Amino acid sequence: MAAIHQGGDVICANSGQGSPKCTRVGKFECKYCRLVKYCGKHCQKTHWKTHISDCRNNPLLKATWRPAWETENRVPAFMGGPRLRVFNFKKKYPWGNMPAFDLLNLASNEGINYKRDLNLLYAASGDIRNCVMTLASVPNECQSPMKVYLNDRDADVVGRNAIILLLALTEDDAAIAADNIIHLWYSAFISQSLYETLNGKIRELVQGVCKKIEGKASNAVLGKTWTFGSRSVRLVLAKKQWLELLASLEIPPGLTVEKAQDIRRSVTLAPERVDYRHRRYFAQPPGDRAGAEKFRGHGVLLPFGAPRDSFTIPNPTLFRDTNSWPMKDDADPINGYRFDKIKGFSCDAPANDIYGKLSFFLQDLVTRFHRRLKSSDIKFHLMNVNAEELHDYVGEILFDRIEIANISDAGYLGMAKTVCYIGPLLKRPSDNPCAALVALFLNAVDEIFDDAEKRKVIEHEIMEVWKYMRPQPPTGPYDASIIVNDVATQQVRDVEKYFDRYMKLQHFDEICEMSGMEFKRQPTIIEAWPLRMKKKPHQKGAKEEFATLFSSSNSGCERYMEWRFRAN
């Protein structure tokens, strides 16, 4: 990254206002904010007039900061009054909202020396993070040929995933590839060099397909395979979607960087959403909320003190027109990874710079992914169909792993239909006893935990929360500490009780009986409740664990299940 030296060091934060830009390594943290580093006292002093607004004069960094609804003595927008429609909801999810995980976890399943072919299906992939995490985590001992199928019903998401793979496979330099991928994926604005790459070798690959289908109907479907030695990418799209993919490599006519930033900020910093932002900020440590506010404002994924002046091109894969930003206001790259892993990642980022740590975390992850691609026999297949129709498109292939995100939630496809339509694509135990379909339930506990249930247990849950968070006497009717306690209660909820009720309500036993499948009582790929609190209140580190979960976007109520066919 522009703000990270090849050796993994942060550049001095003196970005050059009024003096030459410093390019030396930052060695000393600003002691007040611990968000930036300087090479020495001279640069720190020179930069102080600029930095003071992010530092001593930044109210979000003060331990005494309180949300606007409390200081203005009013009801927050998320409480009472008419039910608000979801803000800026365009049904677009370019970034994942659940932490990425290793779908293979070979060490606990087939073994790290596994030699047979491995077939993976991401039936509702969303962004490519789970695939990247999985391939980056494959042990060096495993040299199995792989086929990786990535499907999503949003053609824009499929297109971005294809571009990311092509960026990885057309660039030999791992550092350049990682830099390009991270900014295309997560930054609202990109560098001129990345834009030239998109409109150079990537455009050339896509344009060749578009020329071949010029005379075909708009709904005509065409597949194209690009081969890179032992690696390949096959993309199947309708003609209209191929043309949209080509268009996504170029800035929409008339879209300036200033206009793009205004469009984005009208969502990410919308005045009518201030209470929602402040509710999240109040749960975060000061450095995290300062970093979050800066990312909402600038939209470039870099360490806090890094210069952003080279990121002058609106990301054309996100800005698809001249008047809208595709994501909800709370979309955040951090939501796609384990918050505790980011915070604990060993790197050169300043102690309080959570987005700097994420930058280093992703640099390491994508570099390992790139390394795995270079040394492996991997064939990618990307599709854009409804998940329940996949059996019509994948042919005779069966899969060692299937990941379906949360389409198994009752509000989407549901577990019964998932098992009916997608389950048959899984290998049987005779082919691979470790073959599994991984389902996520994001909403199951909430669906059971209705208002009547809440009234029964709220007092008990609040008392449990207070074992981790010291209660403070309320300062008024809209005291933020009291209001956010309602969010914290999810972290102490008896989720097993409510999920058992959910399984009965959704007839899981009957699903197993009719399908010949079963869910594993002891998961071997991902924990059933991976984000749940592990420590009891009296244990060392419990309060810190509670605070980390509380400051993340997760509740601890997220449930994974691993399904397999019963052995005969």
Residue map of PLM features:
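Cys/His-rich Zn2+-binding "zinc-finger" mini-domains, especially FYVE domains
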Residues: A2-C33
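Domain-level detector for long C-terminal conserved domains
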Residues: A2-G8, T50-L121, S125-N568
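Solvent-exposed, well-ordered amphipathic alpha-helical segments
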Residues: I11, C39, C43-Q44, L61-T64
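Residue-level signal for the start and early helices of compact helical domains
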Residues: K21-R24, C30, T46, I378, ...
